[in-house]
């Protein structure tokens, strides 16, 4: 809905007379100045009125000729007019929804170098975006906070390797919001320099998780494994070294970027290997109910019997499905001491709980569930509400 601006007409209450000490030229200049300000205010007020759909613009009612005002317009007043089409357009609620339109101006930071799986996930979400490589995940977050980029992409879990625990800590450490999720099928390829055969490879470089996901294939080939910073860096290292007995495990895109041959595809042990990525931004999305949504939260609980059961029951009582639950120790307070009446003091590990549930914050069930959860939680924070990625 467009915003409507009403004009404000300012007229002096007292009648202006020419002072005996004011010359004729000064009087005319003063008159022209007041007239120009009047005309500029009138014109701007008429243009500022934006008609709402189904309504008649107010400009017809406000339009007055110079003759009605008893004034004669001078050409000098035209210099005061300004093209209001150059000013920012009124902000609407639709402006904050995620858009599937032009994304050519979106800049997305990721950890790694060109060819990394994180970059592929960013291009899947925004095919025309500009990707910005960062050395560390922390730097990718900071790039968004410093307005150097618009969004950041973060791998959060893999269907084989499980959760990436350190990245959960980053979600709490930074004040960014999850606005989208991306499920990326993983196709691990064995890469080598041009002209090399698979049997020539004696040593392979890749990210530790990629190596773990290809254990059976690498054991069958009898290849030694060496950890690298990420898959794309491994491909770049093999390409620059030129060694015929050294290979890399990386993506097809990395092979194309660094000029390597694909010696084998889909060498991961699980053919249905999928990595889930999160897209983060400075501002949250406005939740909707027109399609399936997911909400991610983090909270901590007071110590007590059955308190975790009670916390999870607030979702079960409202038929809200939990798709993910992850516990992480509180770094600032890893242990909690509880005094007993006769048995001394007991020490408990103090945990944070990360939960993904399948409901939008616009859904009253989710609102009531979180309100109920506050009765048991000592801390709660919504990390984001975003559309579910249903495309595989």
From Swiss-Prot:
Pfam family, one: PDT
CDD domains: ACT_CM-PDT (cd04905), PBP2_Ct-PDT_like (cd13631)
SUPFAM superfamilies, per the entry: ACT-like, Periplasmic binding protein-like II
Record domain Prephenate dehydratase: where: 107-282
Annotated pathway: Amino-acid biosynthesis; L-phenylalanine biosynthesis; L-phenylalanine from L-arogenate: step 1/1; Amino-acid biosynthesis; L-phenylalanine biosynthesis; phenylpyruvate from prephenate: step 1/1
Name assigned to this protein: Arogenate dehydratase/prephenate dehydratase 1, chloroplastic
Underlying gene: ADT1
Record PANTHER family: AROGENATE DEHYDRATASE_PREPHENATE DEHYDRATASE 1, CHLOROPLASTIC (PTHR21022:SF20), PREPHENATE DEHYDRATASE P PROTEIN (PTHR21022)
InterPro entries: ACT-like_dom_sf, ACT_dom, Preph_deHydtase, Preph_deHydtase_CS
Keywords: Amino-acid biosynthesis, Aromatic amino acid biosynthesis, Chloroplast, Lyase, Phenylalanine biosynthesis, Plastid, Transit peptide
Enzyme type, top EC level: lyase
A single GO cellular-component term on record: chloroplast stroma
Biological processes, Gene Ontology terms: L-phenylalanine biosynthetic process
The ACT domain, residue ranges: 296-387
Summary of the function given for this chain in its UniProt record: Converts the prephenate produced from the shikimate-chorismate pathway into phenylalanine. Dehydratase that uses arogenate and prephenate as substrates. Utilzes more efficiently arogenate than prephenate.
Tissue specificity statement from the Swiss-Prot or TrEMBL entry: Expressed in roots, leaves, stems, flowers and siliques.
Keyword RNA-binding applies: no
Chain segment of the transit peptide: 1-48
Reaction(s) this enzyme catalyzes, per UniProt: L-arogenate + H(+) = L-phenylalanine + CO2 + H2O; prephenate + H(+) = 3-phenylpyruvate + CO2 + H2O
Compartments where located: Plastid, Chloroplast stroma
TM region positions: none
GO molecular function per UniProt: arogenate dehydratase activity; prephenate dehydratase activity
EC number annotated for this UniProt entry: 4.2.1.51, 4.2.1.91
